[in-house]
């Protein structure tokens, strides 16, 4: 892959130069208090920002947060992120009240060497996500005018054809940040020749969300362990009753075909935790996966399945995990995710956690992040990379 890196930029002397860093600071906020509930994505960009600060660059950070509708919305402001980023960097971060307006221009103009500014949410401007190339390009022109060089360190957004990811690199000297480089190296290992046995664990709610990655991975993996809400569509494809559990009827035939083609590679739950309702305090017990009672809803994999999955993971040399095994946000239905995560952490293997809900689960369940070889910051981006798709943000860096 022909991509210039942050080290290439640093070698050119960046003291006093304005460097625009596209970060992925799309962190979860508590709906009541507005407090950041998981700062993993902020921490992930620190190596790149720290190197630029150390080198005396004027660092201008930009990011999106949530899905505002192309206009300012206080619920999606990056202001709390500026505060947390400053704490982690050990120096105040200057916050611009807009993205490319008067506040952004004056904030950037006022930066001293080695200082950091954070622009307001990119998605407050309709040009960021516009399908119209002219509108997107006009916004990219304004963003690029704030800087002399561009660093993409937002792996979680490289699968988006957005102005800050795809169009700005065409307007400035551009490089990949430390995080993007590490992500591409790790995922390249998984798509190349991973050490065997290679075991993939997939969870999450929908088969339809994971179908393309299952199709891409099946020929490459030795075992594919399926949990989460998506397992019920596979169980239905085997002819089992799934009660009121999450089911994609239109995917049953597809799952049947996958099971036939997999030749025994796909491992499904043998027991599940079924509840009377989708609620944290609902009465629940463990039932056989091949006969979930009607009106009961499966919300986690059962202990026998956890033990079986753990046994399959024990001898693996490469493991990729994407998607929780159950509704881990409810304590009663977090045991499956926790048990499988611990088995992955304890495996003598190269272990990759594929972003999104899985990364959130590792932190929410208090597991040691250092126990995994790599925790990706890109849920959708990591899956699309494994599917073999061209990622717009990576393509823009290669140009």
Swiss-Prot record:
It is found in: Cytoplasm. ATP binds at residues 210, 298, 329, 355-358. The gene is pgk. Its EC number is 2.7.2.3. GO terms for cellular component: cytosol. GO terms for molecular function: ADP binding; ATP binding; phosphoglycerate kinase activity. The lineage of its organism: Bacteria, Bacillati, Actinomycetota, Actinomycetes, Micromonosporales. Substrate binds at residues 24-26, 41, 64-67, 123, 160. Coiled coil: none annotated. Pathway: Carbohydrate degradation; glycolysis; pyruvate from D-glyceraldehyde 3-phosphate: step 2/5. Keywords: ATP-binding, Cytoplasm, Glycolysis, Kinase, Nucleotide-binding, Transferase. It comes from Salinispora arenicola (strain CNS-205). One of its GO terms (biological process) is glycolytic process. This is Phosphoglycerate kinase.
């Amino acid at each position: 892959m022909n991509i210039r890196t942050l080290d290439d930029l640093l070698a050119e002397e960046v003291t006093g130069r304005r460097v625009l860093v596209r970060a992925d600071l799309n962190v979860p906020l508590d709906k009541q208090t507005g407090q950041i509930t998981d700062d993993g994505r902020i921490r992930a960009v620190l190596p790149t920002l720290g190197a630029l600060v150390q080198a005396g660059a004027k660092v201008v950070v930009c990011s999106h947060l949530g899905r505002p509708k192309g206009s300012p919305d206080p619920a999606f402001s990056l202001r709390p992120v500026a505060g947390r980023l400053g704490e982690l960097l050990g120096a105040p971060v200057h916050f611009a009240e807009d993205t490319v307006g008067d506040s952004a221009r004056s904030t950037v103009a006022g930066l001293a060497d080695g200082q950091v500014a954070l622009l307001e949410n990119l998605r407050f401007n309709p040009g960021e996500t516009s399908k119209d190339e002219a509108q997107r390009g006009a916004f990219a022109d304004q963003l690029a005018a704030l800087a002399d060089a561009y660093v993409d360190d937002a792996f979680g957004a490289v699968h988006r054809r957005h102005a800050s990811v795809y169009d700005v690199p065409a307007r400035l000297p551009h490089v990949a940040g430390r995080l993007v480089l590490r992500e591409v190296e790790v995922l390249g290992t998984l798509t190349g020749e991973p050490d065997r046995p290679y075991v993939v664990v997939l969870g999450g709610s929908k088969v339809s969300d994971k179908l393309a990655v299952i199709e891409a991975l099946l020929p490459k993996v030795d075992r594919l362990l399926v949990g989460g809400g998506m397992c019920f569509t596979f169980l239905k494809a085997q002819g089992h009753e799934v009660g009121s559990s999450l089911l994609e009827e239109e995917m049953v035939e597809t799952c049947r075909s996958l099971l036939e083609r997999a030749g025994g590679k796909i491992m499904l739950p043998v027991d599940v935790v079924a509840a009377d309702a989708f609620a944290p305090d609902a009465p629940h017990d463990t039932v056989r996966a091949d006969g979930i009672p009607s009106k009961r809803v499966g919300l986690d994999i059962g202990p026998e399945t956890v033990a079986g999955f753990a046994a399959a993971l024990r001898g693996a040399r490469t493991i990729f995990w994407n998607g929780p095994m159950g509704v881990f946000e409810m304590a009663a239905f977090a045991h499956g995710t926790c048990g499988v995560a611990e088995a992955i952490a304890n495996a003598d293997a190269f272990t990759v956690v594929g972003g999104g809900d899985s990364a959130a689960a590792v932190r929410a369940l208090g597991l040691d992040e250092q126990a995994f070889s790599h925790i990706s910051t890109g849920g959708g981006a990591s899956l699309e990379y494994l599917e073999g798709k061209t990622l717009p943000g990576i393509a823009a860096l290669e140009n």
